[in-house]
Amino acid sequence: MSCSCNTAALRIFVRNVANIQVPSSQQVTPRALPGFRRQMTTSLPFHTRSLHTTRAARSDSTEAVSEETSTATEKPKAPKLLFRKTHAPANPNWMGEQPPRRQDHKPRELKKARRDHGAHASQEEGDHTEPTKKKNRWRDLPEEERRELYAKMGKEMPDEAERQARKQEQQQQKLRASLEEPKKHNPAHPRRESWQHQKNALKEKFPEGWKPLKKLSPDALEGIRALHKQFPEEYTTEVLSNKFQVSPEAIRRILKSKWRPDPEEEIERQERWFKRGKQIWQRYAELGVKPPKKWREQGIRPNKYWKEGEEKTFKDRQIANVKLHRSLL
Protein backbone atom coordinates (compact mmCIF):
# COMPACT_ATOMS: atom_id res chain seq x y z
CA MET A 1 0.00 0.00 0.00
CA SER A 2 1.17 3.55 -0.71
CA CYS A 3 0.08 5.27 2.53
CA SER A 4 0.98 4.42 6.11
CA CYS A 5 -2.41 5.49 7.44
CA ASN A 6 -4.14 2.87 5.30
CA THR A 7 -1.79 0.08 6.42
CA ALA A 8 -2.23 1.06 10.08
CA ALA A 9 -6.01 0.87 9.86
CA LEU A 10 -5.84 -2.52 8.12
CA ARG A 11 -3.38 -3.85 10.71
CA ILE A 12 -5.67 -2.84 13.60
CA PHE A 13 -8.63 -4.53 11.94
CA VAL A 14 -6.74 -7.81 11.29
CA ARG A 15 -5.40 -7.87 14.85
CA ASN A 16 -8.83 -7.42 16.37
CA VAL A 17 -10.33 -10.17 14.21
CA ALA A 18 -7.57 -12.84 14.36
CA ASN A 19 -5.96 -11.86 17.73
CA ILE A 20 -2.49 -11.96 16.05
CA GLN A 21 0.20 -9.39 16.83
CA VAL A 22 1.74 -7.87 13.74
CA PRO A 23 5.21 -6.36 14.36
CA SER A 24 5.76 -2.78 13.44
CA SER A 25 9.03 -3.61 11.62
CA GLN A 26 7.04 -4.97 8.69
CA GLN A 27 5.61 -1.56 8.01
CA VAL A 28 6.40 -0.49 4.51
CA THR A 29 6.98 3.18 4.07
CA PRO A 30 6.15 4.97 0.90
CA ARG A 31 9.89 5.64 0.26
CA ALA A 32 10.60 1.88 -0.29
CA LEU A 33 8.43 1.82 -3.43
CA PRO A 34 9.79 4.34 -5.89
CA GLY A 35 8.48 2.47 -8.93
CA PHE A 36 5.01 2.35 -7.54
CA ARG A 37 5.13 6.07 -6.89
CA ARG A 38 6.20 6.68 -10.49
CA GLN A 39 3.33 4.56 -11.73
CA MET A 40 0.83 6.42 -9.61
CA THR A 41 2.15 9.78 -10.66
CA THR A 42 1.98 8.87 -14.30
CA SER A 43 -1.48 7.31 -14.22
CA LEU A 44 -3.25 9.64 -11.82
CA PRO A 45 -3.58 13.41 -12.21
CA PHE A 46 -1.25 15.59 -10.13
CA HIS A 47 -2.69 16.77 -6.79
CA THR A 48 -1.03 19.28 -4.51
CA ARG A 49 -0.83 18.37 -0.84
CA SER A 50 -0.41 20.91 1.92
CA LEU A 51 2.24 20.66 4.62
CA HIS A 52 -0.30 20.35 7.40
CA THR A 53 -2.01 17.31 5.87
CA THR A 54 1.24 15.39 5.37
CA ARG A 55 2.36 16.04 8.91
CA ALA A 56 -1.03 14.94 10.25
CA ALA A 57 -0.86 11.72 8.26
CA ARG A 58 2.68 10.91 9.52
CA SER A 59 1.73 11.63 13.13
CA ASP A 60 -1.28 9.34 12.83
CA SER A 61 0.88 6.52 11.47
CA THR A 62 3.42 6.84 14.29
CA GLU A 63 0.69 6.90 16.93
CA ALA A 64 -0.85 3.76 15.44
CA VAL A 65 2.51 1.90 15.57
CA SER A 66 3.11 2.88 19.21
CA GLU A 67 -0.36 1.74 20.17
CA GLU A 68 0.30 -1.70 18.65
CA THR A 69 3.19 -2.43 21.05
CA SER A 70 1.32 -1.25 24.14
CA THR A 71 -1.98 -3.03 23.45
CA ALA A 72 -0.63 -6.34 22.16
CA THR A 73 -1.47 -8.24 25.39
CA GLU A 74 -4.76 -6.42 26.09
CA LYS A 75 -8.17 -7.69 25.03
CA PRO A 76 -9.49 -6.47 21.69
CA LYS A 77 -11.82 -3.48 21.86
CA ALA A 78 -14.37 -2.17 19.45
CA PRO A 79 -13.05 0.30 16.89
CA LYS A 80 -13.39 3.91 17.92
CA LEU A 81 -15.79 6.18 16.09
CA LEU A 82 -13.93 8.84 14.17
CA PHE A 83 -16.10 11.76 15.32
CA ARG A 84 -14.93 15.12 16.45
CA LYS A 85 -15.01 15.59 20.20
CA THR A 86 -17.18 18.29 21.64
CA HIS A 87 -16.47 20.45 24.66
CA ALA A 88 -19.41 18.99 26.63
CA PRO A 89 -18.43 16.03 28.88
CA ALA A 90 -19.64 12.60 27.84
CA ASN A 91 -22.62 11.24 29.77
CA PRO A 92 -22.77 7.42 29.64
CA ASN A 93 -26.27 7.23 31.15
CA TRP A 94 -27.95 9.65 28.75
CA MET A 95 -30.13 6.94 27.23
CA GLY A 96 -31.70 5.99 30.56
CA GLU A 97 -32.49 9.50 31.69
CA GLN A 98 -35.82 11.15 30.90
CA PRO A 99 -36.57 14.85 30.58
CA PRO A 100 -37.93 16.47 33.72
CA ARG A 101 -41.71 16.61 33.85
CA ARG A 102 -43.86 19.45 34.98
CA GLN A 103 -44.58 19.35 38.68
CA ASP A 104 -47.90 21.13 38.40
CA HIS A 105 -50.56 18.44 37.87
CA LYS A 106 -53.38 20.08 39.75
CA PRO A 107 -56.07 20.05 37.01
CA ARG A 108 -55.59 16.33 36.31
CA GLU A 109 -55.53 15.46 39.99
CA LEU A 110 -58.68 17.49 40.61
CA LYS A 111 -60.52 15.76 37.74
CA LYS A 112 -59.45 12.34 38.97
CA ALA A 113 -60.52 13.14 42.54
CA ARG A 114 -63.92 14.37 41.41
CA ARG A 115 -64.45 11.28 39.27
CA ASP A 116 -63.47 8.94 42.10
CA HIS A 117 -65.68 10.82 44.55
CA GLY A 118 -68.69 10.67 42.21
CA ALA A 119 -68.24 6.93 41.61
CA HIS A 120 -67.94 6.30 45.35
CA ALA A 121 -71.05 8.35 46.11
CA SER A 122 -73.09 6.58 43.44
CA GLN A 123 -71.93 3.21 44.77
CA GLU A 124 -73.05 4.16 48.31
CA GLU A 125 -76.44 5.31 47.04
CA GLY A 126 -76.82 2.07 45.09
CA ASP A 127 -76.11 0.07 48.24
CA HIS A 128 -78.87 1.86 50.18
CA THR A 129 -81.50 1.69 47.39
CA GLU A 130 -83.26 -1.58 46.72
CA PRO A 131 -83.26 -2.94 43.18
CA THR A 132 -86.56 -2.18 41.41
CA LYS A 133 -88.41 -5.16 40.08
CA LYS A 134 -89.68 -5.15 36.54
CA LYS A 135 -93.43 -4.77 36.42
CA ASN A 136 -95.15 -7.78 34.98
CA ARG A 137 -97.36 -7.09 32.00
CA TRP A 138 -100.90 -8.45 32.18
CA ARG A 139 -100.65 -9.49 28.58
CA ASP A 140 -97.94 -12.04 29.44
CA LEU A 141 -99.94 -13.58 32.28
CA PRO A 142 -102.24 -16.54 31.73
CA GLU A 143 -105.92 -15.93 31.11
CA GLU A 144 -107.12 -17.12 34.55
CA GLU A 145 -104.78 -14.79 36.44
CA ARG A 146 -105.83 -11.88 34.28
CA ARG A 147 -109.49 -12.61 34.99
CA GLU A 148 -108.77 -12.62 38.74
CA LEU A 149 -106.92 -9.30 38.50
CA TYR A 150 -109.74 -7.69 36.53
CA ALA A 151 -112.26 -9.07 39.04
CA LYS A 152 -110.32 -7.54 41.94
CA MET A 153 -110.37 -4.17 40.14
CA GLY A 154 -114.11 -4.53 39.47
CA LYS A 155 -113.75 -4.61 35.69
CA GLU A 156 -114.54 -7.11 32.99
CA MET A 157 -111.69 -8.55 31.00
CA PRO A 158 -111.94 -7.30 27.38
CA ASP A 159 -112.06 -9.75 24.55
CA GLU A 160 -108.92 -10.17 22.46
CA ALA A 161 -110.78 -9.58 19.20
CA GLU A 162 -112.31 -6.36 20.53
CA ARG A 163 -108.91 -5.17 21.70
CA GLN A 164 -107.36 -5.81 18.28
CA ALA A 165 -110.24 -4.04 16.52
CA ARG A 166 -109.92 -1.04 18.83
CA LYS A 167 -106.16 -0.89 18.25
CA GLN A 168 -106.62 -1.04 14.48
CA GLU A 169 -109.22 1.72 14.61
CA GLN A 170 -106.83 3.97 16.58
CA GLN A 171 -104.12 3.42 14.00
CA GLN A 172 -106.50 4.36 11.19
CA GLN A 173 -107.54 7.53 13.02
CA LYS A 174 -103.89 8.54 13.43
CA LEU A 175 -103.28 7.94 9.74
CA ARG A 176 -106.28 10.06 8.73
CA ALA A 177 -105.22 12.87 11.02
CA SER A 178 -101.71 12.86 9.56
CA LEU A 179 -103.10 13.00 6.01
CA GLU A 180 -105.60 15.76 6.77
CA GLU A 181 -103.08 18.00 8.51
CA PRO A 182 -101.26 20.42 6.18
CA LYS A 183 -97.67 19.48 5.57
CA LYS A 184 -95.49 22.23 6.99
CA HIS A 185 -91.82 22.71 6.13
CA ASN A 186 -91.84 19.69 3.87
CA PRO A 187 -89.40 20.05 0.94
CA ALA A 188 -91.40 17.53 -1.11
CA HIS A 189 -94.55 19.72 -0.85
CA PRO A 190 -93.35 23.34 -0.53
CA ARG A 191 -95.73 26.18 0.12
CA ARG A 192 -97.32 27.48 -3.08
CA GLU A 193 -97.58 31.16 -3.89
CA SER A 194 -100.84 32.94 -4.71
CA TRP A 195 -99.93 33.39 -8.38
CA GLN A 196 -99.40 29.63 -8.68
CA HIS A 197 -102.94 28.98 -7.42
CA GLN A 198 -104.29 31.52 -9.91
CA LYS A 199 -102.36 29.89 -12.74
CA ASN A 200 -103.82 26.49 -11.90
CA ALA A 201 -107.33 27.97 -11.78
CA LEU A 202 -106.85 29.51 -15.25
CA LYS A 203 -105.61 26.18 -16.61
CA GLU A 204 -108.73 24.46 -15.29
CA LYS A 205 -110.98 27.19 -16.71
CA PHE A 206 -109.21 27.44 -20.10
CA PRO A 207 -107.59 24.07 -20.83
CA GLU A 208 -106.86 25.03 -24.47
CA GLY A 209 -105.10 28.23 -23.46
CA TRP A 210 -106.05 31.85 -22.97
CA LYS A 211 -108.13 33.23 -25.82
CA PRO A 212 -108.88 36.92 -25.33
CA LEU A 213 -112.33 38.20 -26.27
CA LYS A 214 -112.57 39.75 -29.70
CA LYS A 215 -113.59 43.40 -29.73
CA LEU A 216 -116.62 43.98 -31.94
CA SER A 217 -117.64 47.44 -33.04
CA PRO A 218 -121.06 48.91 -32.06
CA ASP A 219 -122.23 48.53 -35.69
CA ALA A 220 -121.27 44.82 -35.62
CA LEU A 221 -123.22 44.29 -32.40
CA GLU A 222 -126.32 45.95 -33.85
CA GLY A 223 -125.98 43.89 -37.04
CA ILE A 224 -125.81 40.61 -35.06
CA ARG A 225 -128.96 41.48 -33.17
CA ALA A 226 -130.81 42.57 -36.33
CA LEU A 227 -129.88 39.46 -38.34
CA HIS A 228 -130.87 37.08 -35.57
CA LYS A 229 -134.14 38.93 -35.02
CA GLN A 230 -135.16 39.00 -38.68
CA PHE A 231 -133.87 35.54 -39.67
CA PRO A 232 -133.62 33.43 -36.50
CA GLU A 233 -133.69 30.09 -38.32
CA GLU A 234 -131.10 31.07 -40.91
CA TYR A 235 -128.66 33.04 -38.72
CA THR A 236 -128.23 30.83 -35.71
CA THR A 237 -125.53 31.25 -33.05
CA GLU A 238 -123.17 28.87 -34.84
CA VAL A 239 -123.57 30.67 -38.19
CA LEU A 240 -123.04 34.08 -36.58
CA SER A 241 -119.98 32.85 -34.65
CA ASN A 242 -118.39 31.61 -37.91
CA LYS A 243 -119.34 34.82 -39.73
CA PHE A 244 -117.91 37.22 -37.13
CA GLN A 245 -115.15 34.82 -35.99
CA VAL A 246 -116.12 34.78 -32.32
CA SER A 247 -117.14 32.02 -29.93
CA PRO A 248 -120.80 30.88 -29.74
CA GLU A 249 -120.80 31.89 -26.06
CA ALA A 250 -119.99 35.49 -27.07
CA ILE A 251 -122.92 35.49 -29.58
CA ARG A 252 -125.29 34.20 -26.89
CA ARG A 253 -124.19 36.95 -24.49
CA ILE A 254 -124.67 39.63 -27.18
CA LEU A 255 -128.20 38.40 -27.98
CA LYS A 256 -129.08 38.01 -24.30
CA SER A 257 -127.87 41.44 -23.17
CA LYS A 258 -130.50 44.20 -22.91
CA TRP A 259 -128.13 47.08 -22.23
CA ARG A 260 -128.37 50.07 -24.59
CA PRO A 261 -126.05 53.09 -24.39
CA ASP A 262 -127.24 56.63 -23.79
CA PRO A 263 -126.93 59.23 -26.60
CA GLU A 264 -123.82 60.75 -24.98
CA GLU A 265 -122.22 57.33 -24.48
CA GLU A 266 -123.08 56.39 -28.07
CA ILE A 267 -121.27 59.50 -29.38
CA GLU A 268 -118.15 58.67 -27.32
CA ARG A 269 -118.18 55.07 -28.56
CA GLN A 270 -118.46 56.17 -32.21
CA GLU A 271 -115.55 58.61 -31.83
CA ARG A 272 -113.37 56.00 -30.12
CA TRP A 273 -114.03 53.39 -32.79
CA PHE A 274 -113.46 55.89 -35.59
CA LYS A 275 -109.96 56.68 -34.25
CA ARG A 276 -109.24 52.99 -33.84
CA GLY A 277 -110.29 52.18 -37.42
CA LYS A 278 -108.18 55.03 -38.76
CA GLN A 279 -105.05 53.71 -37.01
CA ILE A 280 -105.66 50.17 -38.28
CA TRP A 281 -106.10 51.23 -41.93
CA GLN A 282 -103.00 53.39 -41.74
CA ARG A 283 -101.03 50.24 -40.92
CA TYR A 284 -102.67 48.44 -43.85
CA ALA A 285 -101.79 51.32 -46.18
CA GLU A 286 -98.14 51.10 -45.14
CA LEU A 287 -98.19 47.44 -46.21
CA GLY A 288 -99.58 48.42 -49.65
CA VAL A 289 -103.22 47.48 -49.06
CA LYS A 290 -105.74 49.84 -50.63
CA PRO A 291 -108.13 51.10 -47.90
CA PRO A 292 -111.90 51.48 -48.44
CA LYS A 293 -113.41 54.70 -49.80
CA LYS A 294 -114.48 55.82 -46.32
CA TRP A 295 -110.86 55.85 -45.09
CA ARG A 296 -109.46 57.18 -48.37
CA GLU A 297 -111.65 60.23 -47.89
CA GLN A 298 -110.00 60.69 -44.48
CA GLY A 299 -106.59 61.05 -46.21
CA ILE A 300 -105.28 57.50 -45.86
CA ARG A 301 -103.38 56.50 -49.02
CA PRO A 302 -101.48 53.31 -49.80
CA ASN A 303 -97.69 53.32 -49.90
CA LYS A 304 -96.39 54.81 -53.20
CA TYR A 305 -93.12 52.92 -53.06
CA TRP A 306 -94.82 49.55 -52.97
CA LYS A 307 -93.67 47.55 -55.99
CA GLU A 308 -95.75 45.05 -57.90
CA GLY A 309 -93.07 42.37 -57.69
CA GLU A 310 -92.87 42.66 -53.93
CA GLU A 311 -96.65 42.53 -53.73
CA LYS A 312 -96.64 39.02 -55.18
CA THR A 313 -93.92 37.81 -52.85
CA PHE A 314 -95.66 39.22 -49.78
CA LYS A 315 -99.15 38.20 -50.81
CA ASP A 316 -99.51 35.50 -48.19
CA ARG A 317 -98.20 37.76 -45.45
CA GLN A 318 -100.64 40.52 -46.46
CA ILE A 319 -103.56 38.13 -46.25
CA ALA A 320 -102.48 37.03 -42.78
CA ASN A 321 -102.12 40.64 -41.62
CA VAL A 322 -105.52 41.54 -43.03
CA LYS A 323 -107.14 38.68 -41.17
CA LEU A 324 -105.39 39.72 -37.98
CA HIS A 325 -106.49 43.34 -38.19
CA ARG A 326 -110.02 42.41 -39.20
CA SER A 327 -110.25 40.36 -36.04
CA LEU A 328 -109.49 43.54 -34.08
CA LEU A 329 -112.30 45.54 -35.72
Curated annotation (Swiss-Prot):
Keywords: Mitochondrion, Transit peptide. Residues 47-144, 157-199 are annotated as: Disordered. Residues 62-73 have a biased composition (Low complexity). It holds the Pfam family Neugrin. InterPro entries: NGRN/Rrg9. One of its GO terms (cellular component) is mitochondrion. Residues 103-115 have a biased composition (Basic residues). Residues 1-59 form a transit peptide. Belongs to the RRG9 family. This is Required for respiratory growth protein 9, mitochondrial. It comes from Neurospora crassa (strain ATCC 24698 / 74-OR23-1A / CBS 708.71 / DSM 1257 / FGSC 987).
